[in-house]
Amino acid sequence: MNNPTISQTVNASCSGTDTAVGHASINKKAIAAAVAGNALEFYDFVIYAYFAVYIGKAFFPVAGEYGSLMAAVATFGVGFFARPLGGILIGAYADRAGRKPAMILTVALITIGTIGLAMTPSYQSIGVAAPIIVVICRLIQGLALGGEVGPATSLLIEAAPPHRRGFYSSWQIASQGIAVAVGGVLGVTLSLWLSAEQLQSWGWRVPFLLSLVLIPIVIYMRRELPETHEAAQERTSTEIVGVVLRDHKKVLVLGILLFASIGVASQIGNYMVSYAVQVLKLSAPIAQGSVLVGGVVTFVFALLGGLLSDRLGRRITNFIPRVILTLAIVPLFMWLVNAPDLVTLFTVNTVIAALTAMFATAGLVQIPELLPIAVRSTGLSLVYALGTAIFGGTTQFIVTWLIAVTNSPMAPAWYLAAISVVSLLAMLFLPESKNIDVRK
């Protein structure tokens, strides 16, 4: 028996039929399934960033203080550059076959990548095969994440009542906060319980292995989802991508520039663990603890940003936090560099996480609202994947390189400020989308 689509349920509820109760129930289920899968995938992705110092030494025995770390974060960036391909393939698949099968596929791919990372022996054990396997695993994870955001966000927006789309889609960013927070808890716990030698030997693998336990649950939840977009198998993926590139160039280009600062700010937040240990010389538990705080803050302020975007509109919720971050990031880093301790690190991470969560939420609902339902998943996947690949994917490598070359710990702040200005300019050319009918 086929499940009704959520859009059908929305129509029924608007016409006053008895399915209104089912609509509310389905929406909660859709949020839970999207959040669980998205959190799992981002958890696996950001865990790599958290433990980059240890992973670098395990798989990339490069000489120099920053050598192995730069090799590790470069491999982290490889996953970002696989995102556009994942966005094209899986995003178009979601517009052709439906949101639900695409969301199940992304979980399967992230599982393969995670198993590979968790089980690969070190360079010392199997030589050059080790970094090659790690790079392949990062590519697979990048494909999955590139194709995850478009279908899942499209489903949430299409499932939501018109006046709640911002709040529903905000759970995508909030779920990333959950992933960061859980990763932070594990990082702090492992740092406290294990010695540096144990962390280097096997401890960093534990968080990857733990995530595998949840995968059957997430797949089951997504299998039970109703569909929000009817399959259109007569269209090929090439045709769908062609429509996006031909008819929606403005949204695509401006969206990529809008997401540039989201990618950079998020990755600088993730990079703070390596930055705190390697540059500020703070202890690993303090560094991991700051990430935990950042994850909790992201969860709270993403939901707040969604509520505000529903009340005030997408543009103003996008604009104000961006301006504040652009103006505040350099003074905040000056404070952190001059007084590197728990309070300053936690404060800087909190400000970055809060402001980024708010404008990321507004952007994540605005872009898909500006795209028609027939190509929404593909368009959003391309915007998100290209924006995060070009800018977010290079962030950790660039700032690590800038710090090493300039000998200035202020490099992350100046880089983020510059990218934020570009995103602000792009945002000014995007129209308000709050009142658009997303079922067309």
Residue ranges and their predicted role:
Residues 108-126, 324-339:
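C-terminal ends and interior cores of transmembrane alpha-helices
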Residues 316-362:
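C-terminal transmembrane helical hairpin of 12-TM major facilitator-type secondary transporters
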Residues 49, 249-297, 392-396:
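Extracytoplasmic gate region of multi-pass secondary transporters
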Residues 52-85:
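Extracellular/periplasmic helix-loop-helix junction of adjacent transmembrane segments
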Residues 167-191, 383-395:
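Glycine-rich segments within core transmembrane alpha-helices of 12-TM secondary carriers
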Residues 373-405:
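A late C-terminal transmembrane helix in Major Facilitator Superfamily
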Residues 87-98, 302-314:
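Helix-to-loop junctions at the C-terminal end of transmembrane segments
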Residues 96-108, 311-323:
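Cytoplasmic membrane-interface "Motif A"-like loop-to-helix N-cap segments
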